[in-house]
Amino acid sequence: MSRVPRILLVVAIILSLASMAEAKTVSIKAVTAWPKSVWEVGNFMKFLDIVKERVAQKYPGQLEIQYAGGPEVIPNQEQVEAARMGVVDMVFTTDGYYVSAVPEINALSVSMLDGWEERAKGVNALLDKIHQEKVNCVYLGRLGHNLPFTIYLTKPVKGLDDLKGLKIRCSPTLVGFLKKIGSNPVVIPPPEVYTALERGVVDGFTWPAGLIKDWGWEKVTKCVVQPGVYNGANVIVINKKKWDEIPADLQKLLIEAEDEAARLAKQRALDLVKNEKEALQKMGVQYVELPPAEAKKLTDAAYSALWDIILEKSPANGPKLKEMVTK
């Protein structure tokens, strides 16, 4: 090898090593609204696995997501505020836990689209703009739905009228819906639900289908009302300053990883709902399928209640979102 090519090779190696030395590892501290053992967090863990694998393949050492824990670290309804302030960088949560700060996020609960379809139709871009303005966070996307909120009861019922007057535990998202069907909504944190059911403080609860065994609530469940309503809107948000620290190619990687994880989460959810129904029926739990007319009353009450709130609290963005997410 002549002297000039040899010098060029040495220079190339030096520049390559310098570039590697300059590549700074971006570290993201993440929390989830539920403990790691809860099924929903499994979708987030899959997302973390996909990110880790892709980073190792394409950008080794440049990005890491450190999972700090669930509500034992920061209470679930305070996590998005913690991300806004930069106490944590990434939050995996659900709409009901920060709807007071971002009312528009409820539109995902009545969305007729899958998460990746929402991105393609511009829903994510609009929600991202809203999140940046209201909570200083970037909206990465929806991760996990297809688990309709379902009414589980400690006593059997025959129809929609039997739900009137019953005290039913719910998240803030479902308060308006339960009032419309004549039930009495009671907002109770998940860890307190079992005791409330056992002591008769409430007659039942609403929860995403397929997930009640995470909390042991199947032991006090006698009846399940069908159909369910809404789609659980579990989402990932990231502190804006932290997002801006992430190079564009790694931002793209995170978005693509979220979309892949969302597709896997959909099938995982469909399988889960089927398995729960089979297991509960074997335990003697009664599934009550409302007649078509009553089922329509139930779903109409659910969707109109939530859209009423969204449109009232967000007259500028609510109509846009409704048009986007309605097929």
Question: What do these predicted ranges mean?
Answer:
Residues 24-113, 132-327:
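N-terminal secretory/targeting leader peptides
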Residues 15, 19-23:
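Sec/Tat signal peptide C-region and signal peptidase I cleavage site
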